[in-house]
């Protein structure tokens, strides 16, 4: 059984752009997301560039976010996170409604303070074996009391 993404992200619909975690450890993650008709980041039947970036950011943040929650928590802690920098992003293609994308991310570096974490990540989004997008981004995540 895969862990619930709700444990590791503060996002909820309609801004939740990850459905399932298929693999996670301390330094890498693989997620999936089915693009549905009610997705707010669609344009003419295609998932937008912004949607791909948000999907990759949410996938990345779950790696670090897992350490802010205990095993029994179902997203009740108040954790905030945001992209602090996108060093490089390339969009090669856009997926369509009903397609399921797979997103893979790897932690490159991480700095932890008492109240927050800053991390650098590499990520890529795919439809089947077709590369849709890549990015390297920095994320800032902290518990919001």
Cite the ranges covered by each PLM segment.
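Compact, glycine-rich, soluble single-domain proteins
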Residues: 45-63, 84
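Catalytic strand-loop segment that frames the active site of acyl-thioester-processing enzymes
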Residues: 12-48
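HotDog/MaoC-like acyl-thioester-processing domains
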Residues: 62, 96-145
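Short boundary/loop segments of OB/S1/cold-shock single-stranded nucleic-acid-binding domains
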Residues: 5-9, 94
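Hydrophobic beta-strand-centered segment that forms part of the acyl-chain substrate-binding groove
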Residues: 64-104
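Ordered, amphipathic secondary-structure segments that act as subunit-interaction surfaces
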Residues: 16, 58-69
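Short Pro/Gly-enriched beta-strand edge/turn motifs at strand-loop
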Residues: 1-5, 103-105
